[in-house]
Amino acid sequence: MAVGKIVISVASMLLVVGVAIGVVTFVNKGGGAGGDKTLNSHQKAVESLCASATDKGSCAKTLDPVKSDDPSKLIKAFMLATKDAVTKSTNFTASTEEGMGKNINATSKAVLDYCKRVLMYALEDLETIVEEMGEDLQQSGSKMDQLKQWLTGVFNYQTDCIDDIEESELRKVMGEGIAHSKILSSNAIDIFHALTTAMSQMNVKVDDMKKGNLGETPAPDRDLLEDLDQKGLPKWHSDKDRKLMAQAGRPGAPADEGIGEGGGGGGKIKPTHVVAKDGSGQFKTISEAVKACPEKNPGRCIIYIKAGVYKEQVTIPKKVNNVFMFGDGATQTIITFDRSVGLSPGTTTSLSGTVQVESEGFMAKWIGFQNTAGPLGHQAVAFRVNGDRAVIFNCRFDGYQDTLYVNNGRQFYRNIVVSGTVDFIFGKSATVIQNSLILCRKGSPGQTNHVTADGNEKGKAVKIGIVLHNCRIMADKELEADRLTVKSYLGRPWKPFATTAVIGTEIGDLIQPTGWNEWQGEKFHLTATYVEFNNRGPGANTAARVPWAKMAKSAAEVERFTVANWLTPANWIQEANVPVQLGL
């Protein structure tokens, strides 16, 4: 017999969700020595929402003053409380800087200024979350995944602040000062994760929440492809964006030119801004072109950077969204700088980046990004992305330690080259790198190479982790002769729940037989998630792998790391000349 639609309210559905995750207890109302232990409706609602929170006590305390049992109102109240806590953390940071007065050194001032900036980013995202939620979660519907993504960013911005502080006393002071807002942000993620997970387990999609429908049988694979059109392209990318990425080959290049597949393509795109060192464009520097881009742009700011070496540090502010840069080739258009923690006073890891993308919707093609500080510069980032939905094709990233900082949001890289030594692909984002060349370099004497260092501090409630899919991991020409004596590893855990998957990748013999390494002085490897599947090459032999890494036996075990799942809701581009592989 066919199952009919069951129409319910959001409040009822959340109650059912509470039952599904085992948090609503029906108490016997009968009398007895124990008296009436029945919880009132408000307490039940709070208990239900807070059951999955990392800090249940803090969660309940936050919601106790809210005199309502409406889950929508409770969740919105929780978001407002989180916003208030982040505001206090921002004010605390400013007062800490003021309290240090003239005694503050350049590095402390730089890191506190950065803290203030990223905490403001967190506030802006919380404001967006509250606005998008509306008065009722029914208005959120299919935005639930996006709301959770923004919440992940709010949490990450606060960890960014602490991560950049190297001075121990200041790190302790700031850690304690923003602890409350970080806890509330963490709890908020847990609440959203519990709701979306429980609904998924009950075959309730987020769109059903919007429609008020429970119990419909979903279409096949809807959870993977619900945000793709009939051609397999992401709905969030406009027709103009798709054409831009298809057309943005190196101007005049043959169609087969490139680092790998999907090379040139004619360069028919019409830029809004042109940068040229010889004065033949509107601007001589990239930074000038970025400043000319509008804020909160519903369209695209398209910057064509002509061939040349541009020695400058470029920052794309958070409000300058939807920037698309393309050049004349990854070895022809090069953006380079040499700022580093080791050699540049007043510099932190986050501030060392040659190019720093703070905004959403960034796209790049046919550009080389370099940090030339060298191994003695220690942390020296070539490219850092903080914004959500970054799409990078046919680019090259060269550095030593911390080359590619995939710091926040959802990021997709295809057909790139990235080189480095220590933790040279690292961050706290959901990142997939496909069909790319990864090169370990020769660093300082005795230095060990680590390809990845993921910074997942939150666990499985968030999608934070690095996926290397169908790549090649090799030694560069300077390391080639010493590749068997210089130790190189696939990665090490930067944070307690570090997550990294290497799938369908050719691994050279430079990688140690153990595959993965521990973070010195920490036990993060005991809670980290490291997965390998269907790899090839001499370095892919898993016989001597560390016991805490998982060697997947079937595709089902790594399905969650596909583009369609890891970067949900499938927010990436599939183009004819540079295709996106949604599955394995």
UniProtKB/Swiss-Prot annotation:
GO molecular function, one term: enzyme inhibitor activity
Active-site positions on this chain: 402 (proton donor), 423 (nucleophile)
Site for Transition state stabilizer, residues: 401
Reactions performed catalytically: [(1->4)-alpha-D-galacturonosyl methyl ester](n) + n H2O = [(1->4)-alpha-D-galacturonosyl](n) + n methanol + n H(+)
InterPro entries in the record: Invertase/methylesterase_inhib, Pectin_lyas_fold, Pectin_lyase_fold/virulence, Pectinesterase_Asp_AS, Pectinesterase_cat, Pectinesterase_inhib_dom, Pectinesterase_Tyr_AS
Region entry Pectinesterase inhibitor, spans: 40-191
Keywords, comma-separated and alphabetical: Aspartyl esterase, Cell wall, Cell wall biogenesis/degradation, Glycoprotein, Hydrolase, Secreted, Signal
Additional remarks: The PMEI region may act as an autoinhibitory domain and prevent untimely PME activity during transport.
Protein name (record): Probable pectinesterase/pectinesterase inhibitor
Pfam family, one: PMEI
Entry-listed glycosylation sites: 91, 105
Pathway named in the protein's UniProt entry: Glycan metabolism; pectin degradation; 2-dehydro-3-deoxy-D-gluconate from pectin: step 1/5
Any one annotated GO CC term: extracellular region
Protein's GO biological process: cell wall modification; pectin catabolic process
Region (Pectinesterase): 272-571
Species this chain originates from: Brassica napus
Tissues in which the protein is found: Pollen, and at much lower levels in pistils and petals.
UniProt cross-references to SMART domains, sorted A to Z: PMEI (SM00856)
Function summary: Acts in the modification of cell walls via demethylesterification of cell wall pectin.
Signal peptide: 1-22
Residue positions binding substrate: 349, 379, 492, 494
Annotated EC: 3.1.1.11
Family under the similarity heading: In the N-terminal section; belongs to the PMEI family. In the C-terminal section; belongs to the pectinesterase family.
